[in-house]
Amino acid sequence: MNTDAQALHNSKADIKLHLGKSTTNGLGAGADPSVGEAAANESRDDIKEALAGADMVFVTIGAGGGTGSGAGYVVAEIARELGILVVGVATKPFSFEGEKRRKNAEWAINKLGRAVDTLITIPNDRLLQTIDRRTPLLETFKIADDVLRQGVQGISELITEHGLINLDFADVKAIMSNAGSALMGIGRASGDNRAVQAAQQAIESPLIEVSIDGAKGVLFNVTGGYDMLWQEHIMRR
């Protein structure tokens, strides 16, 4: 979904939805969330049609701009009205993107959090702790986008991919329905003790802004190669 016709044209998505054709005349929202909000409201019927029949919807936004910030919560509200489980994933802008985008992001994340079952917030500034300082700017934004992708993929594959310890939609719904704020950690390791190292990395991930103490539920996705041994299990610390 986008207000920008050119961005939609360049998108590789199978299904594309042009929001607010009259509101923006095919242009973007100009970093104004109120324009994105108006565009989504103009296209409510189209959004309903696109979401009809879904059991679970991810509403992903790069908070701070116009379209995602303004339209995200509207899409989430429509999905909830249709009885769909809705998971929001929002990236906070880097601090170097400026005060306006920071304020837009705060507004957008607050609105989205009220409209979804579960909201995962990814603080882009904390990503800077994990990447080389010499990383080019465009590559930095790509890394931020990829973390968002990993969040969505990690949850969706619990349902779509058959695992050795299988979970289904009912399991995911039990954890994520009306859950509120959620945290996401990612860990990778190889060699000796890799399972424990990866789990520890996920728990101590810089993406986690607050303590996980008091969490009421956990979704844990472990992926390994064909050489993973049965002894490699996640041990209690």
Model regions and ranges:
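Tubulin/FtsZ superfamily GTPase core signature
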Residues: 1-237
